[in-house]
Structure formats: structure tokens, C-alpha cells
Amino acid sequence: QFRAFWETQQPEASKTRVIIPVFNCRDIFDRIIGAIDERQEDYVWTLDSAPSLENYTVSVYSPKFKDAINPDADNLTSWFRDWQIILRRNVPCSVVTMQYGNVETAYGTVNIKPIDSPFSYLADILADGNLLIEKWQSNDFWSRVVNCTSHYAAKTASFDKVVLDALNVNEFDFVSVAARWGTLNDFQKNLVWLWYRVYPTDEYYSYACKKASCVSEIPEKIRDEILLISNRSDRWIEERMAAVRALSFHSFDDSYFALMDKLPLDETKLKLLTYQTHEEKTYAVKVISNMLRDGAEPSAIATTLLERDYPSLASYMKDEMGCDDVIDEYMAWYRKNKIINRYPGDYPVQMTFDRFDARYKLMHKLQGQDCVSFWIDGFGSEYTPLFLHELKVRGIVPESVKLATALLPTETEYNHQWDEHDSMAIKWDRLDSFSHKGMPDDKSYYSCIVHQLSVFSDAAKKVEELLENHEYVVVTGDHGSSRFAALAFHQENVIPISAPKKSTVRSFGRFCELDDNTGDIIALPHTVLATSNGKRYLVMDNYQHFSVSGNAAGGNTDEHDVVGEIHGGNTAEERLVSVIVIKRKQPLPPVTCKPKGGLFVTKKNGHVEKNLQFSRPISTLEVSYDNKEATCTMNADGAWLVILDGVTTDDITLSVIANGRLLPNVTLKVKTQGISKNDDPFGGVGL
């Protein structure tokens, strides 16, 4: 275009004058135009001066950058007008013009850089822009980075400043960034992906992030890359664990555990689990089962590998109850072999339980106290050390912990004392449900163990809540359950025992109910005779069972763990329960009661209703008057509606028992509906 313009002839009479300053470009002019004839010589001027000691850099941008940068000149006219002022600042300068396509790169006293792409701009303006590689990200991404640099002067900021500002942090710490991963946008995540490419380190985070081909792979690479290398330093393991915990994986799939299975050492597998998910905890129980089969000791595993990361399993494996040495020794053996998940053989020690009180005898001592009974179905003494651990975590120390015996047979229907003797009782069924059948869509026994352990953290929390409104909480179970009795059900070398004629076999053969017409019976070997509600039973005293069909833990093998525990028999894990009494550290203020809305009530046909309010929430209420029981119902707001019938007097004195404690009497004033009683018929005139 310039050459065509230069060579165009103009009329001699034309008064048009075009002056085109071309800076530092005589060599380019000579190359494009070549020789000039004598008619043109008078129209080319070269303004020259002594070489400058200064070097100048002028970046020429396309209009697409007009909103992303603050140029020194926002068009060519401004540049022609102010270039001397701009260059005098002695800093790199910038021009935005639509003529950027006609600009050529030049080097020398004045360096000219035409810039059309966002990446080229970044490489130009960032102090360490040379470390960036354009193919790492898309043009749209680099454009967003350009927007982040609009307030920086050229060469005064580096890429790390851009990243830190975008992440709103003062220094880059991968664990802190990972903890916010779910709240970061795609742009911020891609900056993290770029960080270790621009600034690689010897940290595990750097190694794993550089393995990610895109930002979406970062969590997976952080989690998995350490499983694929042969040498894992303790530092890398610690860094990986901190990052994985921060990323908070909600679940792990089978492919992840397949990678874990390839690791040669079981100890390493346990070290690489976060124990934040149910799947990981289940996998840990599986790994520990293999370790115990190979001769490892439960206490050693618990102390060195579990106490910090999975304290509930550590407690289950190593803690003792401390009430009875024989029982502690047996339960330690039982818990170890339960995790091994193999039938251990014959019942190791024939035990008698005469030295232990019945459960109700121990609980009866709290009768008359402000005490709530918390029953956990299936809470055998197997779990007592774990529950004590969970209470301790919450700063709760029981007043007493004692072993007691459940009633034979050890089934709930023979042990439901909570609805026989205690109006202030709650009951949980989840532990027993887990023990019998696991979860509806999960029949792994190792998974079942994890569910069982989780009950006691929740139970300790429940105790804490109950103590807010009660002086005492007593925790117990109706019975325990036996894994080995379930495994024995399918053992070829365990021969079922034939039940007496006309008896009914119950609970997978753990006991049988004798016919009412059966005469005196001598207990069979390994059985005990029991009586309940006029019925007689033969109860198994070991892991054997009466002959009956069923599928308790059917299909369980070393490679395939199948859920299932049963009860009804007389083994220690089925028969022994704990009675744990917990008292508030500080006494509660006495419960007080007052009628809601005042003392007056309306009577209609002898029927009276009144709401009573209490100074704190109560669980049970008994109200009587003139030896008549009132009907009491708790309202949604915590007040209680008391309904009285057969009222004949004008004053009603109520006897109130709240939470098992007798409160001061409450007197109500009765008025009959539709009749107003006036004790002064003369209106106060004094006659």
C-alpha cells in the first residue's frame, strides 16, 4: 500500500501535501522502495541525530486489547501527538491501533513489538512471561489472565502474583487451596494446574499435578499417583495424606482399592487411607483381617497404625473393660477372631455367669431418681470398651460400669424390661439390625463391623444430650450377639444337635422351646435349661446349634465376607451386657411446674383441661387428683395437656410426678361454664 501510494503520480497543480513520519525505518524504506528517481529525491528527508544511549520498547496492540490494558496511546493519532512525552518516561510503552497489522517487528534503539494474541501480551508484560507455554491453555484462558494483569505496569509483576491475586491468598499452599477446591471456579483451578508447571518443586503436590493432563484430573492424580511409584518417602506420604484429606473425597470406587491391593505391604495400605469414608474404613478392616491371619497382634496394629486416624477401631481392638479379668481375656480373643472372620473352633472356655448380677437388679438402684434408661438392642459387653472410649472423647466419665446378665434365652422378646419397669426409657435398634443383616444393599461383614462401631459415637452424643435434662443416664443392652455361632451354622465339622421331641427350634438353633407336656428334662451336653414366663427352654452353651435350616452368614469365605451374627444362646458375647451409669457433673435445678394461663380452669360436665408448663423439658408426667389418674399428653411446645374427668369440687389439688420425681402440689380454681359466681350480691354497698 505504501509503495503504491509513493509511486502514484499527482497533478502538477495539486496543493495536497502528505507528510508520513516513519520512525527508525530507513532500512525498511530502502528495502521496500528500492531506488528513487531524481524527481522524488526532494520529497524524502532523513532526520538523523547522534545515537541515543537509551533503548525504547514500543508494544503495538490490536483493538481487542482495548478493554484489557491501559495503553499509553489508545490510537495512532494520540501516539503521533504525544510520542515524545511517552518515550521520555524511559519505560516500555504501548499503543493500541487498528493499524497493528501493518506493523513489523523492529530491534535496535527503538524495539517495536506487534502483539495480536493474549498470550503474546502476557509473555511481553510479565517479568517471567518467558516461562509460559502457549499450548498449555486456550486463547480464552490467556485472555482472562490478561484481564487480571491490566493494573500491572510492564515487567513489574510475575505470573505468581497473578495466581496469588486470583486465588486471594498471600502465598501458595496446595493443601489450603485443595481445602477450597469445591468452591474454586474453573479459571482458578487452571491457575493451580499451571502453577507447578511454571514453578515445579520436589513436593508430592508438584509431581502429581504435573501428571494431570487437565485440571479435572488433579484430585484423582493427587489421590492415586503415590500408589503407582515404587519409592514413597515419608514426606511424600504425609503431603499426599494432607492433600487428600483437604480434598474431602466422599467415596472411593473399586478401581481405587484395586490399586491399593497391589501395594506389597499391608502397613502401607493403612497409612494411605484417610478413614474419612465408609469404603475406606471397610477396606481397613479387610486389610487388618489379613494382618491378623498372618500373626500380627491387634494391640500393635491399633497403637501404631490406627489410634490417630481411626480411633474407634483402635479402641475396639485393644481396650479392656476392666471389670473381670476372665471376661476381658475372652473378649480380646473374641474381637480378634471376629475381625479375622474365620470360625475359631470350639468355645475356648466353658463359663458360668453366676458371679454377675442380673441387669434389672443393678438398674433398680436408680429407681426414684431423675434417670433415663438408654437401651441399645444388641449391646453386648463386646462393645463396652469402645463405648467408654467414645464417652471419654466427650469428656464423660461414668459413675459406675458393671457387667450384668441378660435373661435366657438371649432374645429381645425375653429381655424387653424397658417397657415393663421404666417409663423413662429410649431404645435404639440399629446395632442389632446391622449385626443380623447389615445394610439392604451391602452384605459385606467388614462393612457391617464399621457400621457397628459407628453406633457408639452416636450413642455417646445421645448421652450428652440426655444429660442436659436429666441427672442420670443408664446405658445397657438387652443382649449381645455371636459371630462364631453364625459361622458354626455352616461348618462341616460342627454337627447339629437334635432337639427334644415336640420342641420348637428357634433363632437358628440357638435354643429350643419345650412342649408344655414334656416332663422333666435333663439338659443335653453344652446346653442349659431356662424358664421364662412359664415356658421352658434348652439354650446352647457354646457355638453349636440345634438342627434346623437357615442361612446365617451363608457363603462366607476368606475371599468373600458375608454379614451375619445371631443370638439366643448362652455364650459370653450373647449373655453378658453392661450397665453403665452416668451422672451429671453439676446438679440440675429442681423442676418446677405452673399452670399455663393462670390457675383458673373451666369445668363442663365434670370435664377439665389444663396445660402445665415446666421449668425444663421433661420426659414423663403422671398427674392424679383424689386418687384418680389424669390423662397427660405432651404438646409441640413442650407444655403438657392434662385432662381431668369427674371433677365435682371448685378446687382441684393435683399430685404431679415429673421425670419420676414428686413435685409440689398444684391447685387449680374451677369455674363452671356459663355460670358466674358472685359472693357479694349487693354490689359492695355495705348492707
Predicted regions and their residues:
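…; additionally, a secondary subgroup of soluble metalloenzymes is captured
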Residues: 1-371, 378-473, 477-687
